[in-house]
Curated annotation (Swiss-Prot):
Native source organism of the sequence: Bos taurus
Membrane topology: Peripheral membrane protein
Class of this enzyme: hydrolase
Superkingdom of source: Eukaryota
Cellular-component GO terms for this entry: extracellular space; plasma membrane; side of membrane; synapse
GO MF, one example: amyloid-beta binding
Summary of subunit composition and partner proteins: Interacts with PRIMA1. The interaction with PRIMA1 is required to anchor it to the basal lamina of cells and organize into tetramers. Isoform H generates GPI-anchored dimers; disulfide linked. Isoform T generates multiple structures, ranging from monomers and dimers to collagen-tailed and hydrophobic-tailed forms, in which catalytic tetramers are associated with anchoring proteins that attach them to the basal lamina or to cell membranes.
Gene (UniProt): ACHE
Catalytic activity: acetylcholine + H2O = choline + acetate + H(+)
Family to which this protein belongs: Belongs to the type-B carboxylesterase/lipase family.
Protein name: Acetylcholinesterase
Amino acid sequence: MRPPWCPLHTPSLTPPLLLLLFLIGGGAEAEGPEDPELLVMVRGGRLRGLRLMAPRGPVSAFLGIPFAEPPVGPRRFLPPEPKRPWPGVLNATAFQSVCYQYVDTLYPGFEGTEMWNPNRELSEDCLYLNVWTPYPRPSSPTPVLVWIYGGGFYSGASSLDVYDGRFLTQAEGTVLVSMNYRVGAFGFLALPGSREAPGNVGLLDQRLALQWVQENVAAFGGDPTSVTLFGESAGAASVGMHLLSPPSRGLFHRAVLQSGAPNGPWATVGVGEARRRATLLARLVGCPPGGAGGNDTELVACLRARPAQDLVDHEWRVLPQESVFRFSFVPVVDGDFLSDTPEALINAGDFHGLQVLVGVVKDEGSYFLVYGAPGFSKDNESLISRAQFLAGVRVGVPQASDLAAEAVVLHYTDWLHPEDPARLREALSDVVGDHNVVCPVAQLAGRLAAQGARVYAYIFEHRASTLSWPLWMGVPHGYEIEFIFGLPLEPSLNYTIEERTFAQRLMRYWANFARTGDPNDPRDPKAPQWPPYTAGAQQYVSLNLRPLEVRRGLRAQACAFWNRFLPKLLSATDTLDEAERQWKAEFHRWSSYMVHWKNQFDHYSKQDRCSDL
């Protein structure tokens, strides 16, 4: 999930470097015209792949495999249709187009943003998937990992360099699949009740890809009875929604949710808000022609006639208020794919026997602050004033009432240093990260564990030596992915030897989980053990260059505030407008008193005092 985006290269893998990788082993090797390892028969027809070199050996890659009919023209906004068979042999040797999306131009040329931007042409004809498999093909069925990218449901692509599957496939001998799915209005615009734009078609794209995996992955050496679905940010929220949707649940067997959860406050909207956003976008692009009026069919027909870029150019204007970590078109609680809110489905679900791995990074909120929080920029230390902190809380928790915002301020202020710019910067980062990622993930882990699931939890704490974001941002959202996918194994990317070893360890944890539902290595019982997360002990591990360290209570105090106290406070004061006004007045008096006391104490501390007492 990432705020606004700009294309076309991944700065960490610059064009000269990509050419070098291609020439000396990062690209395809010369193969005989019909290498049997690179010819596969799937239900749609025959495929020809290519052999790629990873640092320790070759893998087979089948890139740009169509799994759906192009969702263009009259198919815009509709559920995907399976790809019809093709004649002859289809070349699956290059990534295909990226789904049409907003492109980030806030920091042009900066590698920290460019690495997430589209690296292929934008098109609505984008429903393709990719398969990496060991070379030669496994002789016995091999566990399968299926990746869902993040990007706030408005951006992302399976072709990004950071999602290169060759390293994990070669190192661990697993089959890896990734797919494109529609994002933004193309994937999530919803007019609930309308057959023309039902919503959630991006999730249906993902489900169709999972069905394709069940039908075809055995041809690549994969085991369709051992499929692990994993994703990050909006990809993790998507994984969670498939867990909560019965037609999806039978298509995979284990789940990994990295820095995201379906119960996050940004991850879904209700039917009323979904319709409001859809009709507002329509008005912004001049639909229906002639102004107000018209039915859903006419409105959708008009929207289908608009150029794709028109929809992208206006989609951010449908949000109800200024915010960070909120996205225009997201999954809708439609009564179909999601029969109820994620929170209700999690509370009511039966998760006995489910195996889940969940986690967060150390500084989940920092990335989003440079996309709209007052006083923040990647180009300075972002040392904010108290006024900017207070304003930042309102954009960081945009749906909060005045009472809720005051409670957030009270909880996150260091009252011994209420005006300290660095502490205020860290506090706002924690507000955004805890509210949107850490505490929804912790809540999900606890509920799943309490209902019989076997859960493992982590916090990723290593800041990559190659990271281009400023130091104050710490370990930002999304920057564990390069280690999970094994990019440090590529020597030309200039990671340290320690980071290479660390990446190998993480790939082993993820692959072990895909194989057995347990990240621990049964071949190394003397290694530090990763214990399951339970609702009582709440054990999780820290992932960094040091050996595993077991801890308890992932941001427990902060998450008690978000998951327990704040909902009860708001419920208890729902109709108490006068009480809220009185509480605010008392709070402001107390807050002013604390600031005054601190100033007086600092003044006193600087005075000369009797040295002979």
